[in-house]
């Protein structure tokens, strides 16, 4: 769940750096709502991928509940609906605190959570999946969390949001790179399909390295942001692993470590902003 926790954490930390205080209840509510939206999206994705034939015995990724027969697709979809409903209820409170911008972000996030694998043209079955993640788990989540605290939007918030969004997109890129062949068999034509493996590998390098330019972009506004450099060796190790790992289940570990990199980067950035 780090992909949903990190942007709220960073947006709130930046607001703390700006205001020297935090509205803790709205911050906690935003965190829970973001987690519920991610849970709902993952659950619906689990059921929808099974129904569309994307989860086959040849799939390299971890076992999934619907494909393994642990639960029916209908049961998983009901669980997703419960999760989305919980996020909606929390969103009512957040809308009362933050006004119409938060209402808009909340409604868009819920709609996107369904549209990711639902509807006639699912986002996950197109080349726009990484863009979706960049926008919703980067730009909107960080900036929304910051706005909830400050009722404003700054260049620094956008810079932080961009960095977190790039790393979130890298997580999805690894997933789609690993599953390219089985995805193509199910007509799931992701960005990796259109780029090819070599250019997808080059894109992964950019997504991982560009966030480390953030301290430079801040131009001494928040010198503590240089803390993120502490996880640069981890990032470089990941890039080497991605480039040399034979295609197979080893990419599950690369996927998990890419998510860990985003968590480490977000945590170090948050600490650097508030210390």
What are these model-predicted stretches?
Residues 2-11, 131-146, 164, 193-197, ...:
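Small-residue-rich segments of transmembrane alpha-helices in multi-pass membrane proteins
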